[in-house]
């Protein structure tokens, strides 16, 4: 049976990337514990509007753990203390206790400038994909589905890599602000398949160069990214990306 909880919510307010920003505080009363975290934020916005205050801004879309837009730093943890493999929108208030102080912040990264409050611009990930996260194909008739033989193991591993939703939790958790888990997942999903091999060297070099250009840091293997990834991406992908990158550089 659901019960109601009351708590103090500290949420980040910032008018843009150059604004200093600050925390505002709001007392949330009698919130059902079967309410999702984003539904609770909806209630916050309604209460702020009714009080004549500026509403709180955060990003969201599908609310089904698919799109990766609900990127919030909750009590010092990307996506909050959810079940392993879950996003902010899959976090429920039963995870919190009556009287708690809950802190909500945006992703903190030079590569993710704040648009407003807790909404950040994750367009840097799109630019990394545009640098090489694709295969070049001729237009025309598609190949027969069974024309290229791929082992079940390779197909499964490539699909696991492809489940990355580009939410940015890996960057937010990393002390260096590295996007290596994201980049390595996108490189791996193609490197594991024969369609991705012809451009593998070019892809690894181009995507890492773009990642560095956009202000993301380097990986130092602390595995913080792996611990918070909502799709359970493995740092084995980072090892694969390093192999792809070193091989490409040696071949130059």
Show where each model-derived region lies.
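Eukaryote-biased recognition of intrinsically disordered, low-complexity regulatory segments
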Residues: 4-27
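Short strand-turn-strand beta-turns centered on an Asx-Gly dipeptide
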Residues: 12, 29, 74-76
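Short, flexible N-terminal segments of the mature chain
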Residues: 21-39
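Well-ordered beta-strand positions in beta-sheet-rich domains
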Residues: 22-28, 86-88, 175
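Ferredoxin-type iron-sulfur electron-transfer modules in oxidoreductases and energy-metabolism complexes
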Residues: 35-54, 102-252
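Short, structured protein-protein interaction patches enriched in aromatics and acidic/basic residues
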Residues: 57-69
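Glycine-rich phosphate/adenylate-binding loop and adjacent beta-alpha elements
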Residues: 74-97, 101-104
């Amino acid at each position: 049976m659901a019960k109601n909880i009351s708590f103090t919510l500290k949420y980040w307010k910032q008018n843009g990337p150059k604004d200093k920003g600050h925390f505002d505080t709001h007392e949330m009363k009698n919130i059902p514990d079967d309410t999702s975290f984003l539904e609770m934020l909806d209630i916050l916005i309604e209460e702020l509007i009714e009080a004549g205050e500026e509403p709180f801004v955060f990003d969201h879309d599908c609310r089904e753990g698919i799109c990766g837009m609900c990127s919030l730093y909750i009590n010092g943890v990307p996506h909050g203390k959810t079940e392993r493999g879950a996003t902010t929108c899959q976090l429920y208030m039963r995870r919190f206790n009556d009287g708690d102080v809950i802190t909500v912040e945006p992703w903190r990264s030079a590569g993710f400038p704040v648009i407003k409050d807790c909404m950040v611009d994750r367009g840097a990930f799109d630019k990394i994909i545009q640098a090489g996260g694709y295969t070049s194909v001729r237009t025309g008739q598609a190949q027969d589905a069974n024309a290229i033989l791929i082992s079940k193991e390779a197909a499964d591993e490539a699909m696991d890599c492809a489940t990355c939703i580009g939410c940015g939790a890996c960057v937010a958790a990393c002390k260096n602000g590295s996007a290596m888990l994201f980049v390595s997942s996108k490189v791996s999903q193609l490197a594991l398949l024969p369609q991705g091999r012809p451009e593998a060297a070019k892809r690894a070099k181009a995507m890492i160069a773009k990642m560095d250009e956009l202000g993301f840091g380097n990986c130092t293997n602390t595995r913080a990214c792996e611990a918070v990834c909502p799709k359970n991406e493995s740092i084995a992908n980072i090892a694969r990306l390093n192999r792809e990158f070193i091989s490409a550089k040696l071949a130059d």
